């Protein structure tokens, strides 16, 4: 293969890597768990969870029950951990 062909192949592979959707990236398993809705162990606080069907972080009121880890204090933290 010529050097031009190799450069073209390398460019295409780089482009494909950049276009890989976030949904195919690996997320922690707890991002796919349901958040602890309607469970009250303390005061309800504004929180965010990763909604696996919408593939985005969503606001909810967290009752402070540590059922799983799919709850975050900020949208940016949720996005960083689960959305990519």
From Swiss-Prot:
Protein name: Kunitz-type neurotoxin MitTx-alpha
SUPFAM superfamilies associated with the record: BPTI-like
GO cellular component, one term: extracellular region
Record function comment: MitTx, a heteromeric complex between Kunitz- and phospholipase-A2-like proteins, potently, persistently and selectively activates rat and chicken acid-sensing ion channel ASIC1. Both alternatively spliced rat isoforms ASIC1a and ASIC1b are activated, with a higher potency for ASIC1a (EC(50)=9.4 nM) vs ASIC1b (EC(50)=23 nM). The rat ASIC3 subtype is also sensitive to the heterodimer, but with a lower potency (EC(50)=830 nM). On rat ASIC2a, the toxin shows a very weak activation, but produces a remarkable potentiation (>100-fold) of protons when the extracellular pH drops below neutrality.
Residues annotated as domain BPTI/Kunitz inhibitor: 31-82
Source superkingdom: Eukaryota
PROSITE patterns: BPTI_KUNITZ_2
Keyword Metal-binding: no
Domains as described in the record: The toxin-channel complex has a triskelion-like shape with one toxin heterodimer radiating from each ASIC1 subunit. Toxin subunits protrude from the edges of the channel trimer, with each heterodimer interacting almost exclusively with a single subunit.
Cystine pairings recorded for this chain: 31-82, 41-65, 57-78
Pfam families attached to this UniProt entry: Kunitz_BPTI
Native source species: Micrurus tener tener (Texas coral snake)
Signal peptide: 1-24
Family label: Belongs to the venom Kunitz-type family.
Complexes and interactors: Heterodimer of an alpha (Kunitz-type) and a beta (phospholipase A2 homolog) chains; non-covalently-linked.
CDD domains tied to this protein: Kunitz_MitTx (cd22610)
Stored InterPro entries: Kunitz_BPTI, Kunitz_BPTI_sf
Miscellaneous comment as given in the Swiss-Prot or TrEMBL entry: Negative results: the heterodimeric toxin does not affect ASIC2b, ASIC4, Asic2a-Asic3 heterotrimer, Kv2.1/KCNB1, Cav3.3/CACNA1I, ENaC alpha/beta/gamma (SCNN1A/SCNN1B/SCNN1G), TRPA1, TRPV1, TRPV3, TRPM8, P2X2/P2RX2, and 5-HT3/HTR3A channels.
Tissue specificity field: Expressed by the venom gland.
Modified sites of kind Pyrrolidone carboxylic acid: 25
A molecular function GO annotation: serine-type endopeptidase inhibitor activity
Annotated keywords: Disulfide bond, Ion channel impairing toxin, Protease inhibitor, Proton-gated sodium channel impairing toxin, Pyrrolidone carboxylic acid, Secreted, Serine protease inhibitor, Signal, Toxin
């Amino acid at each position: 293969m010529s050097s031009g062909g190799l450069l073209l192949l390398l460019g295409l592979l780089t482009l494909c890597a950049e276009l890989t959707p976030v949904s195919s990236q690996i997320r922690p398993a707890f991002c796919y768990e349901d958040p602890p809705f309607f469970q009250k162990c303390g005061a309800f606080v504004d929180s965010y969870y990763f909604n696996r069907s919408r593939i985005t972080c969503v606001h909810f009121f967290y009752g402070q029950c540590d059922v799983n880890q799919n709850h975050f204090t900020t949208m940016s933290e949720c996005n960083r951990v689960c959305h990519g």
